[in-house]
Amino acid sequence: MIKKYNTNCKGNVIKKQTLLMKYTPLVFLPVLFCFSSVLFSCSHDDLEKKKDPTTENPKPDEGPQNPDTPGTPGNNAGVKDLISKQQFLELFPYRYGAEQSNNWIVNPSKDFYTYDALMKAVDLMADLKVVIERKGWFQKITRTKKSTNETKVIREDADFSASWNNNVVVRQEVDYADFISIGSLEVRKRELAAFLANISHETTGGWSTAPGGAYSWGLHFREEVGYDENSTTGYREENNVDYPPVAKKSYHGRGPIQLSWNYNYGQISEFLYADKNVLLKNPENVVKDAALAFQTAIWFWMTPQAPKPSCHAVMAGLWLPTQQDINEGRKPGFGATINIINGALECNKADNDKTQSRRGFYQRYLTVLNTSDPNCECQCDKMQPFK
């Protein structure tokens, strides 16, 4: 889950870090950068959350609540080259909809995390790119929808252009069509395995003696157990000026990355719809539309959270550690993705069940995808968190 962790940077890490980042004058989400205001916040396991396996699969709201369909072909052809529908089913035999009353066979009427939904999400994301400009802790984000060439500033901190802010502008462009499409075949397979492993850990329903093994239970939960849309609310940061919570709405963990907290829902809503209010007003849409749910996970994976690189950059071989990174033990590899997602809680300490879970999923998925990572820097026990 994206967890909240709160650090000092007007928006730093973050929630169980359920995964996204907090953006308040400067917070990223899950941990992202702690730069809530900056981008998002991104720690995922602050508070161990349980997800609800019994909720029915409602239909998504119509109209503006759902991202529009891209006008040009997306990037899923590349992802399809790496994983077939049959392999997807092999990876996730006990995904959401698998019920004990039915011998843990997925109920077709409740099947949510489908192969087709993932491919649709990849296509939708491929139509979007952003330019992130930072001046110190403050940022400006410009979004472009490629099929229409429509460009819009979706976030600009008040002090980004302040007369006193003499910081040099640091500019990054993120093209979401690059998801699992950069590098050699082996590099791309490893990135796909790493992405699926991390979202599997966030949504796992497995245990050591579970049918099929503990690492066959990724994507089992759709949202946290104990929450429903009518009575229980949580993960509301009431005093958040940029992304104020809507009355009676709950921002608990939902989707593959377990998106949590109103500031995270607001940020992903800005990105997808150029309007923060769509998901602030309708956070439940994340569990009504499986493609949207996968989009939240891809967004988190692809978006850098300064001073952190994106998980994509790490696995695609695009991240070059600074001398400070080297001094603090941070190296490219799967372990660095754990550090990005939830380093403050899982890294720079004795290896633990959470990091072992992520690695277990990663190794299994590499095998199913017919590849390996022989020189893997898979652990983060000697890596200091990004800060």
Specify the residue positions occupied by each region the protein language model found.
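Short, well-ordered loop/turn and helix-capping segments at boundaries between secondary-structure elements
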Residues: 44, 265, 303-307, 367-371
